[in-house]
């Protein structure tokens, strides 16, 4: 469809980020200045009634526009004006003066300023942009007294990619877009900030990880004072999915642990500290004003956002710090999310996270167990999530990740999940049928959020309709097979009836494959709106006139090769070859000369062109109005869509776990009250998948029923650390409701899992390896209970041998005696085997090895009894230590043993 005309009365455009700008929806439909005066709305409606249009879905491809800047390059390494504050704004050109005014309001953000087909930035932002994104640093004339100022820019059509890179690097971006296409006489184009992008508030699909939540968090701190402990309130929201949760606790370590678990993309705080101890190093801390975090401002923000008369129903008045954090978060959202009219960021009512809802996993344990990323390089492959994730949808992937990061402690809830997994394992046909329905589903959670915020495109709405239409099919498959399931499953089995009506409305209104652009038409089916049909009938008449005109001009000119064509810049024209150009009729007017052809217009063609442009503008405007109405309908049901989406996500996670269990020879663990942890032929869920040429050696473990501490000895590199980790991973898998890699399992619920596996220097904190190891051990001894699972891989290695042995012995005694925590302690201190002679709840186990001459064969088999040797010298030889060094080591060992 032709592009917009150059008519100065053309409809104003709204700023819209990464697609063509959307036309403003006026209150009366079409501005009088743009209406084709020959056809009133009544006449067009009557035309549609007399010539009804039939639905004819068709594919439309959005045009991709590439443009080049005309600014000259400036390769200076030291720009004259490296910061906007160095310049007197009154000496700048009007455009740059406006830029500096906006920059002063957003000094902490990269300001991108729309100029034609580019987003440009100037001064320090231009320097930053050119360095980070490897763009050419150019210059622009800033005024007679200023000269050229630094400039860098990105094409409008590539803005999402470049902004996404800035967001990933931790920057926030303010976008200033054009709010009109033609300025008033003697004035600049109207521009303003239309969107602020920050790591925690983005909604664009290309800037989000599809399979993990993008949390924005806010924290309020009350430091310890006299007899008052350190207290904190935390609010977190995923703007893209609408999930909101709040909590209030004590203890800075608990806050550090919670923030590490959450992994927020952005953390808001009004604390003056630049690097507080309670904030994990990897988090992005955004400093904000303290006013929005005050109690009155926070209450007002909550009442306004949720449209409430009071806050009693939310349960937040009893959590004053969490309430203040939530208010500050909402204020930040309001400042960074300029929304379309009748749109809002659809956030759920805050869910209060209670203490004891989830198994506690500190940051060290998460790293050691490699739940979602490997320790070596932080990649997904090789993690537990990689090994068990068979989900088919993005929302299902996020759901499974949340389950892994916060395993349940409620035995009934765990059993409900496990029963569903068992049903899906046993009923293979049901599982496969559900997975076929799940595979093509879009991300309903985030699509609904974009619709509610007024950012969704036509293709987003079509994807929503497709997903909603699958809900009854999923429910029908589950009917009769689910006896008792979690409450969230009801949103799938008994969905909101309005959702199917909404899907039908989307299908009735939108083409199956609409274009990306919302401003150029081609969105709406024929037969949906009489006024639109009338406009399309008139456009068909104009097309017929153009076809007839081409035939007439061919006859008049005697040129059978003449073509009537259209160009977005030049409009309609008659094209003839160079050879025929001299014989054209006198009433033709030369429009353009090319290498091989000449282009002409006629007065009649020019007059008709204006009428066609007016009709097209009205038709496109009407399509946009109809689309916006439909988008508002979708946004109004965003909460219902998301509830259904959460149920689909949970079902996807369960079917994925069932698929993993069915293909991996897993078993359904017997979940019991108490402290039992009994595993037969248990395997490491990740390592067994990584092995190619060998089979994983399964092993048993029995804790909590007579034995509370296992002292595990054996050679270096024999598999002790793997054994420890597999026990922790199986405990965790059981508490998310999954089957586990074992022949048989009987598992009680753990309140925490602690690991101390390896240690490295923390040079930044001035701590040696030994001090890091002792700090981790102290944390375990302070917080472990008889319901905890403790996995220790060596203690006391970084100091003198007897000091280390003494510490290891005392720690073991405390764990087995005072705490009675279920513990597996892997060590090379063979003296610890004597603990079993002193305490009935301590048992010795070893990893077997087979000696054949100078060679060692690691059997990876765990057996009762303590090892007497570590075979460290043999392990050194296998690692490639030079032979003379190995031989000398044996001589020294013989001397030491003889002296002993």
UniProtKB/Swiss-Prot annotation:
One of its GO terms (molecular function) is ATP binding. ATP binds at residues 714-721. GO terms for biological process: mismatch repair. Residues 1-88 are annotated as: Disordered. It comes from the Bacteria. SMART domains: MUTSac, MUTSd. This is DNA mismatch repair protein MutS.
């Amino acid at each position: 469809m032709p592009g917009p005309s150059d008519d100065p009365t053309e409809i104003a455009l709204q700023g819209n980020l990464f697609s063509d700008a959307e036309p403003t929806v006026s209150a009366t439909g079409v501005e009088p200045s743009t209406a084709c005066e020959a056809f009133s709305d009544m006449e067009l409606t009557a035309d549609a009634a007399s010539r009804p249009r039939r639905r004819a879905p068709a594919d439309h491809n959005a045009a991709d526009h590439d443009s080049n800047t005309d600014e000259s390059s400036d390769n200076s390494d030291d720009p004259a004006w490296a910061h906007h504050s160095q310049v007197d704004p009154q000496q700048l050109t009007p455009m740059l003066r406006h830029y500096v005014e906006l920059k002063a309001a957003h000094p902490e953000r990269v300001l991108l300023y729309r100029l034609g087909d580019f987003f440009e930035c100037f001064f320090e932002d231009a320097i930053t942009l050119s360095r980070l994104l490897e763009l050419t640093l150019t210059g622009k004339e800033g005024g007679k007294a200023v000269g050229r100022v630094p400039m860098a820019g990105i094409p409008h059509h590539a803005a999402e990619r470049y902004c996404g890179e800035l967001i990933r690097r931790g920057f926030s971006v303010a976008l200033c877009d054009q709010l009109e296409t033609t300025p008033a006489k003697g004035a600049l184009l109207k521009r303003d900030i239309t969107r602020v992008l920050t790591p925690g508030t983005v909604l664009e699909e290309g800037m989000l990880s599809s399979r993990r939540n993008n949390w924005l968090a806010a924290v309020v701190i009350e430091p310890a004072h006299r007899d008052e402990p350190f207290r904190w309130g935390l609010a977190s929201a995923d703007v893209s999915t609408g999930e909101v949760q709040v909590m209030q606790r004590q203890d800075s370590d608990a806050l550090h642990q919670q923030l590490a678990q959450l992994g927020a993309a952005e953390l808001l705080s009004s604390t003056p500290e630049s690097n507080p101890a309670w904030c994990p190093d990897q988090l992005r801390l955004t400093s904000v004003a303290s006013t929005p975090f005050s109690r009155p401002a926070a209450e007002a923000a909550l009442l306004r956002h949720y449209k409430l008369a009071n806050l009693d129903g939310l349960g937040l008045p009893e959590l004053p710090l969490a309430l203040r954090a939530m208010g500050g978060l909402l204020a930040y959202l309001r400042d960074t999310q300029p929304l379309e009219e009748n749109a809002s960021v659809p956030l759920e009512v805050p869910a209060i996270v209670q203490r004891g809802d989830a198994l506690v996993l500190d940051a060290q344990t998460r790293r050691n167990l490699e739940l979602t990323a490997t320790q070596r390089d932080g990649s997904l492959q090789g993690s537990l999530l990689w090994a068990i994730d068979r989900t088919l949808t993005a929302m299902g992937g996020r759901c499974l990740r949340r389950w892994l990061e916060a395993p349940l402690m409620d035995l009934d809830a765990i059993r409900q999940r496990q029963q569903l997994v068992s049903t899906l394992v046993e009923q293979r046909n049901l599982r496969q049928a559900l997975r076929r329905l799940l595979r093509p589903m879009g991300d309903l959670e985030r699509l609904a959020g974009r619709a509610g915020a007024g950012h969704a495109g036509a293709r987003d709405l079509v994807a929503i309709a497709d997903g909603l239409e699958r809900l009854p099919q999923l429910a029908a498959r589950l009917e009769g097979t689910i006896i008792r399931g979690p409450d969230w499953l009801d949103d799938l089995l008994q969905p909101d009836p309005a959702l199917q009506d909404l899907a039908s409305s989307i299908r009735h209104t939108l083409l199956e494959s609409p274009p990306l652009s919302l401003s150029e038409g081609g969105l709406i089916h024929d037969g949906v709106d009489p006024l639109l049909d009338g406009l399309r009938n008139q456009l068909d008449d104009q097309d017929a006139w153009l076809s007839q005109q081409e035939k007439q001009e061919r006859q008049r000119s005697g040129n059978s090769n003449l073509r009537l064509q259209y160009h977005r810049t030049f409009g309609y024209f008659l094209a003839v070859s160079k050879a025929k150009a001299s014989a054209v009729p006198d009433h033709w007017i030369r429009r353009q000369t090319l290498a091989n052809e000449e282009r002409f217009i006629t007065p009649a063609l020019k007059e008709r062109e204006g009428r066609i442009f007016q009709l097209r503008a009205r038709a496109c405007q009407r399509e946009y109005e109809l689309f916006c109405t439909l988008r508002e309908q979708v946004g109004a049901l965003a909460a219902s869509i998301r509830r259904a989406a959460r149920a689909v996500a949970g079902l996807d996670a369960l079917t994925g776990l069932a698929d993993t269990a069915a293909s991996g020879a897993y078993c359904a663990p017997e979940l019991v009250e108490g402290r039992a942890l009994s595993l037969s032929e248990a395997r490491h869920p990740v390592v067994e998948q990584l092995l190619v040429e060998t089979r994983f050696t399964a092993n048993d473990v029995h804790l909590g029923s007579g034995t509370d501490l296992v002292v595990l000895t054996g050679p270096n590199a024999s598999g002790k650390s793997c054994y420890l980790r597999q026990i922790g991973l199986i405990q965790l898998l059981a508490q998310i409701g999954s089957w586990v890699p074992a022949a048989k399992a009987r598992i009680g619920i753990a309140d925490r899992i602690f690991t101390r596996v390896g240690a490295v220097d923390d040079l930044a904190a001035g701590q040696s390896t030994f001090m890091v190891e002792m700090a981790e051990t102290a944390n375990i001894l302070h917080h472990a209970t008889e319901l905890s699972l403790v996995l220790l891989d060596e203690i006391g290695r970084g100091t003198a041998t007897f000091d280390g042995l003494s510490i290891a012995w005392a720690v073991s005694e405390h764990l087995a005696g005072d705490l009675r925590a279920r513990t597996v302690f892997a060590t090379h201190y063979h003296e610890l085997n004597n603990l079993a002679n002193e305490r009935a709840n301590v048992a010795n186990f070893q990893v077997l090895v087979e000696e054949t001459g100078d060679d060692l064969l690691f059997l990876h088999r765990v057996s009762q009894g303590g090892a007497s040797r570590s075979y460290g010298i043999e392990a050194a030889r296998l690692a490639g230590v030079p032979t003379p060094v190995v031989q000398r080591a044996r001589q020294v060992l013989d001397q030491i043993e003889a002296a002993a």
